[in-house]
Amino acid sequence: MKTEAKKAVVASAAMSHTGSAEPATDSPPAAVRDLGRGTEPPVHVRGLVKRFGRFRALDHLDLEVEAGSVHGFLGPNGAGKSTTIRVLLGLYRPDEGSVSVLGSEPWRQAALINRQVSYVPGDVALWPALTGGQVLDALAGLRGSRDAEREAELMERFDLDPSKRVRTYSKGNRQKVALVAALAAPTSLLVLDEPTSGLDPLMERVFTEEVARACGEGRTVLLSSHILAEVQRLCSAVTIIKNGRVVEHGDLGTLRRLSRTRIELGAAADELGPVRQALEALGLDVVEDGGRLSLEVPPEQVPTVLSLAGEHRIQDVTCEPASLEDLFLRHYEEV
């Protein structure tokens, strides 16, 4: 898929090829700036079906990303994430369903829409004979707009040497070129597919800070990542897909509250016995280990469990809401 990845970076991520090189300016054309200003969300997908022969990669998938948010898009390899993203970029046409990106069907107005979409894939393929700076120049020329000051700031933050040729870059440095181009471009929507692949922990932190900044500036981010902690830090909402279908969607805080809470109670063994009996009478699975009781509690039973702990004067009580990893594994550990 490296050829397709390069096509996506050139045609979308940085940067739509309109058929002729245009001078880089400080702002996109007025027609582009007006995209996505209506009431419709920047990304609005309903009943999306995509088939490859007899294989149904996407099966009536729904996805909605609110303006100005960072939205996590999760699923293991083969779940349909990359196929969905390629439909959003106009590289694939859907077989069924409706898809709107910034108010338009991406395969019908690809050149116009892609000027407002920055895309970063997980495996960036660039022109090996060019320097990093020349790649950024080329991408800015194809887009027709550029913020040179912001670009320079990002190169410094990501510790990117633009004078070196792409063929000498590590995977992480190639990733940095795409991130600098995407974040510096005056676009309203960023589609990031495993964007921190190849980055070290320090650069991952810089990435997190820059995405938060982009969101603070009113830009919309669709983030697909296998690093669940990264998604949990950045995203206000998530969509989890499995076998081409959505299995979980919504505000991350709400999803965590609606999931089981992990509760631990600590006390002497003779004090825990009556509490354990009361908890098991509620139908809860209780694990006792080293003077502590551990259990996962549905949201509607959390007040009852805490009340029982109070009645039995258990003072060592810890509650831990479900993490994003818990939500994810709940669906993918099912047979």
Task: Annotate the PLM regions.
Residues 2-14, 18-19, 23, 299-335:
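C-terminal coupling/interaction segments
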Residues 26-42:
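Extreme N-terminus of proteins, especially the signal/transit-peptide cleavage junction
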Residues 40-242, 247-248:
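ABC transporter nucleotide-binding domains
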Residues 109, 251, 304:
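Short acidic active-site motifs
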Residues 131, 251, 271, 298-301, ...:
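Short loop/turn segments at beta->alpha junctions
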Residues 207-296:
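ABC transporter nucleotide-binding domain
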